[in-house]
Amino acid sequence: MRNSMSRLAVIFGMTLVVAVPALADVTFKKQTLSERFVAEGCDLADFDKDGHVDITAGNTIWHGPDFSRRTEFTPPADNPSGPTKTPYDPAKGYSDYFLAYAHDFNGDSWPDILVYGLPGEAAHVFVNPQGKAGHWEKHAIFDVADGESPDLEDMNGDGRPELLVHSRGQLGFAEIDWKEPLAQARFRPVTPKSPENDKKYFRYTHGYGAGDMNGDGRPDLLTKDGWFEQPADISKDTIWPFHPGPFGLADAPRGGAHMEAYDVNGDGRADVVTSYDGHGYGLGWFEQNADGTFTEHRIMGSKPEDNPQGVAFSQLHALRLVDMNGDGLADIVTGKRRWAHGINGDVEPNAPPVLYWFELVRDGKGGATFVAHQIDDDSGVGTQVTVGHLDTDGKPDVIVANKRGVFAFFQQ
């Protein structure tokens, strides 16, 4: 369950039309909301219930429809030292706002904001004051949210989301008590506690997701090493059966970002779509065969010749599957996270921070390819990329927040 399907001066109203040389006639208009580093995650919702979608990143809400008005829902951070020292330094530091998700947590019909801080820190919900002025109440609802790509997904089938995180060396998710939604969520481990797992599943582990891999209607857990099958009864904590992948490369063992389960080639079986290394190269989909094994189909590698359109970029630290062109097939939206580890960290840290969508094209014979289309070359992704509707034309738009700023891309 994703709500996305909701310099010192801040610059408003800057627009740029970016033509996409695509097979599909898709173009985007770029609007720069801020050129400051405020966050690496963002989301959208109608926070003030005026009928227009708004954007949140960091401690700020930009109000639609033109996003020229902004308000702070919580005071600016005042961190004298550490990795999130303020003001946030894009060349050296990080933000307290790693990812953000909009959802009505307390059931009053007003969207609240869930913020994941740095990996291993607490997850907080900021409660919407129902349109009243002032800062929003802050509630810590989970104390140790590990992993670099936490999410918000319905894992138990009750129609309401859980925190898709792992914690203290165990994979799983955190279940919210909807009678007391702002209290501490209960962690539901699916792997055993062990010294080996403490090293394997730690605060900076990359690659995590959920999706129904075996067609039983229950979401399973995805990792770079394989998938964990949800049992029919999860009323009590239990170890979930593991099915090996792996979903990556031997020379890129770190893992990517958000992982997705989707029937890419239309054969009725769920496949896995993922980036390979959140701080390196690689994007691909892994076809599930009839016997449960997987065949890799690489979409993009480290060299232009690895991709039919000659596209190659590194640090794919956020990914979503969304139908971008209305053909009924889910496409990939991803890009480059700039300066993830500073100006000299990782590979090609100063290459253009690009933002792309990869169009899924099926051949009708069980095969499929993804065609690369550039959206922008001066933004990229953060640790999150959000796709939703910013206007009323019905076409999916894209928003990102990262060390370059905060940007909205309106599909034309």
Enumerate the predicted regions with their spans.
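Bacterial N-terminal signal peptides
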Residues: A9-A19
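Beta-propeller-forming repeat regions
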Residues: A22-Q412
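N-terminal secretory signal peptides that target proteins for export/translocation
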Residues: M1-S6
